[in-house]
Amino acid sequence: MTSFYHGSYVRYVIGGLGLQVRRYKKAVRGLFSGPKQPRSVLELQAKVAALIVRRDWKGLEAGTNDMAVTADHNRDPELMQKAGQAFERLGNFARAAELRLSARRLRKGKSANEWTGENLGSDTLLIDLVEDDPRSLGRVIRHARLAGAAAAYAQSATIRVEPRLVSILQRTFPKATVVPAQRDVVGDKHATFEDLAWVFGRDAEKLAADFVPLRADPELVETFRKRYRSMTDLPLVGLSWGSKSHTKDVPDFPEWARFIAQTPAKFVSLQYGQVKPALRRLRNGNDARLIFDDSVDQMVDMDRFAAQVAALDAVVTISNTAAHLAGAIGVPSVFLIDDNFQTAWPVTGDRTPWYPKGIVIRKEGRPWSLVLDEAGRRLSSILTTLSDAPRGR
């Protein structure tokens, strides 16, 4: 089941009702507007959905390939995008990049100034890392290091990004100019998420080997580290437990509270929003086990949040912005992923090339209590390794 958002049952119910209303409106719009999907496409999508439920990944790869062929034949960018997303989850990054780029070109056409990986000399390069929904930063953070790699191909490169990420990207890629999304900028060549993935993200092994961590403010990192270290000699572990999304399945509060109580670490909340009701349930009477630092608000100051994350020894989190940021900074992390086939996390293996220092633990039909037991064992191994080596990332 999904945790009550931040510990408030009322907010959880209201949010769920809102989701149902949005789904109803979307269904109604689908009935009365836009082209109808051919019966063959609907049957193919139903087949793919059944394979996902059975977790038949070999069968799904074949089904996804059928979906891609159908999408290409029908010139259907939405179906093509879905096939690309599925291939990434299945670990076929080359096919995923190809389909996503083709889907974008079908929707918007191929631009004459589209960058395809060539050296640009004196030509300027504009790299757009802007999502339609500024609250959704996972894809932006994932592709940020690819933007830095692309910037090296031009004497003058500009990266356009959501304002909260300007500082950390500018610090990480000082040779580029990083500007907020609202800035009107032009370039001789233009690159998007899809172009970056096509140029740099088709080989999973190379993607992992070429990892460049985002660089948090070193002075702020040290400030947070000293503050938290003054409270404990235990390892410092970031924790993010909940989501506003009703489509995500995450551990409930009693399961998280048991995990906290059983783990020899000092936890630091990385959860966004109004979390005080949740803190009471997670601490379970032991306030000292979980630090809540109200000087940090990731919705306002992502650079400060990045420094807080970088100050920690490890992170345990569900799939959210904290997961992507911890992975992109290079903090050893444990990512808890549900069985819903809707995010970029892999469905097989325990690693993702996007974040080489992260460990992916999928639910795989188990109770969350057992998943958290595994997370505890993997976290213990991470902390033991850190204690045996000089600190540094």
List where the protein language model places each region.
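Catalytic machinery of carbohydrate-active enzymes
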Residues: 2-393
